């Protein structure tokens, strides 16, 4: 799932830091997701990211 997030970052020329600041999702949460300490973000955070990038929540689950 994090790979999908990385693809969106690259496609939109964003950093995780920028996304954190823009969405209010703590950078520590994104870092833990990247490292694998968090396997899946909560539905609330996935919804925020999906809206931010203009994709469906399902995009992250494919």
What are these regions (language model features)?
Residues 1-15:
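A short, Lys/Arg-rich alpha-helix, primarily the initiator
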Residues 7, 21, 32, 62:
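DNA-binding alpha-helical recognition surfaces that contact promoter or target DNA
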Residues 13, 40-43:
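Residue at a beta-strand N-cap/secondary-structure junction
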Residues 18, 29, 59:
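Residues in the helix-turn-helix
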Residues 25-40:
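Recognition helix of helix-turn-helix/homeodomain-like DNA-binding domains
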Residues 44-59:
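DNA major-groove recognition helix of helix-turn-helix/homeodomain DNA-binding modules
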